[in-house]
Amino acid sequence: MRFCYMELAESDIRQTIKIRDMAEINQYRKELRNKIIAYAMREFHQRGVKAVKMDEISRGLRVSKRTVYEIFGDKEELLLAGMKIERAEYKARVEEYALAHARNVMDVIGYIYRLQMERNQQVGVVFYEEIHRMPRILEFLKEEHDKEYDDSMRFFQAGVDEGYFRKDVNFEVVYESSRICMSEMMHQQLYKTFTMQELFDNFTLIMIRGFCTDRGLELLDKAIGQL
């Protein structure tokens, strides 16, 4: 009987060690996955997706190419994972600012404008050109748009309630038409003629000004003027 207990105890110890080892392996893989994404996204932003090879990524991180492919089946899968993380981080930053710092919707718009300026400085034109030819990326962007609809409508209503957005505007039309126009701008490759900042300032910002009240315009000009 004592021998059985000893065998059971040894079995439990081995199982505990196995679980601990698996946890360490999983943690390492998770950290490596995040490192691959961070490294790849920096390169994608600067040089475009096609120019960056998977073996470049593996050499840059000093891991085997096989390991990279074990984690990400192909480059588009890697890009998609990176875009999902970027989108989640962007939403978290905006939400944190809105809850902790913003006094009204105009403050939030000013903050979003600042984030957009930062991104325009970090991301090259080639990146935008290439991602709009990738089916999985386009599907992800459409899904994000659909999920953000309700939040956007609540934001617009908050702006109306605060007196910064006009009451006579159909914001469903604004939301859908802006999506279609932005998609068409990318399709027509206007970013080759104008910078992304110019497109944002002369389309998105003009559209925002169109549904602001006089009070809203005053705060909008003040927020942007401080950047």
Predicted regions and their residues:
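Short hydrophobic/aromatic patch on the recognition helix
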Residues: R62-F72
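Basic, helix-initiating cap at the start of DNA-binding domains
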Residues: M1-R47, A51-V63, E77
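C-terminal peripheral helix-coil segments that are non-catalytic and often amphipathic
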Residues: M1-A23, R154-A158, E162, Y191-L227
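A secondary-structure capping/hinge motif
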Residues: D74-L78, E129
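Hydrophobic alpha-helical connector segments
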Residues: A81, A92-Q122, Y175-S178
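Alpha-helical DNA-contacting segments of helix-turn-helix folds
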Residues: E77-E86
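Short secondary-structure transition hinges
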Residues: M117-Y164
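Hydrophobic alpha-helical bundle segments that form small-molecule/ligand-binding pockets
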Residues: D146-V174, S178-C181, M185, Q189, ...
